[in-house]
Amino acid sequence: MSENQVEMIDDEALTDLACAKRLMTLYGERHIHYCDDVGSWMEYDGTKWARVRQSVIASNYADESITFILQEVAKQASESPGGNLKDKAMYLTRFCKKKNARSLFDMVRLAEGIDPWKMRDFDLAPYFLNCANGYLDLKTGELKPHLPSHMCTKCTGVNYISQPHSSYWVDRLKEIIPDQATRHYVHKIMGAALQGTVREHEIYFFIGKGRNGKGIIVETVAAALGDYASTLPVDVLMASRYASGQDTPTPYVASLRGVRFTRSNESEVGRTMSASMVKWLTGGDELRGRNLHENPISFKPSHHLFFSTNYPPALRDANDHAIRERVRVIPFTVTFSEEEGSRDVGLGEQLRTREMKEDVLQWLVEGYQLYMAEGLNPPPAVKNASGAYFEENDVIGDFIQESCILNKGVAIMRQDLYHAFKQWSENAGIRNPLSNRAFYQAMDNVPGVSAKRTNEGRYFEGIDLIPVNARTPINMPGGDRNDRI
């Protein structure tokens, strides 16, 4: 380090606080910095910023900072007039004691209060992607050199290349998704996930039973994206009768900060999707989460959510307009034979090589460009599969079809209708039916039915119960209701 990086050493420069300031002058913003909202030091490794322990800062940076100051003190002592030599020697002796572990950690702790950063200061460029070989401008395709000032905590882990090594990845996609329009759509939704801002507010269901390759696609994309990909526990998306407390740690939320692509896999048969959680995670509102033993952090969402499953979750209200606008079902219709399915292991290994991950990253960037040029525009196969999903998972619709009559000239007190719904749910084996409040809200979405109020109470106009002896039970599409919650 050169002499002009710091001021000349004097008495004031040898205090603990002065040493902490000197540490940040030498290394702050370019090599290390402290984030006080999560209580962690960040270190720049030449590509991205990452959390490090306090001991790393003490041993690698504070110690070196003291060594540099000692060199300056010794140099000035040797060059000073004889009258000051003794004083400088005393300072030098005293300062050597700062090389012990306690003094180094004291210096680091003092440095933590010098212009600390927040985690929200990182990953703020949604149209840039940090790759192993540079900082990629998604809009122009220009690859720029890495800089600490880019404030990235994520990296793909592989290089961006403008042309693929081979056609292997694209050829496999043609086998897994033969329909060209659906394959083109998947290309665009995967590419759209590269942007660090939420524009579409959608969740993508990859649905299909058996060996169909959907898992290979999702996991290969995640492998190519490295730090930009994360896994969301499937239970987060499912309805539960137990609500988390306000102060409960939510690491699954905190882990989404800065992520572009998050996936969740395989719900059990009969699980019910949490509409409120899906709306929250796919919306554009600020998210707030907390890791264990840390303060909460707030951030704008940047992730795009993909859900792969053999058994799609049930819905409590299939007429919920917000959910219909969010859920897109991509059908995987090809089922490979057992012999063909055994290739998946080898295929997965092949797609995880560095060359293949670079090809997939190039394909994703190409998909982003297609998305920006064309928009998403779901093809008929996706529209049909999405419509079928809502029709087959319409609990309110099944209740009305089996137990009710819709007519302008009829009405029923709303508590009587809910009581009938609870009885129907019990007979259907639904263990966790809608609450009365959720049921009343769902009824507001039923065409031709409206909520009214009189002195006698609240009622629904346009609907009434069919006499019990005139009802014809229907079969629940997709199998038994007994496992529903």
Per-region residue spans from a language model:
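Feature primarily recognizes SF3-like P-loop helicase cores of small DNA viruses
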Residues: 2-39, 70-485
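Trp- and S/T/G-rich repeat-edge/linker motifs of beta-rich repeat architectures
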Residues: 40-43, 48-62
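Active-site-surrounding "flap" and adjacent substrate/cofactor-binding loops of secreted or lumenal enzymes
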Residues: 62-66, 70
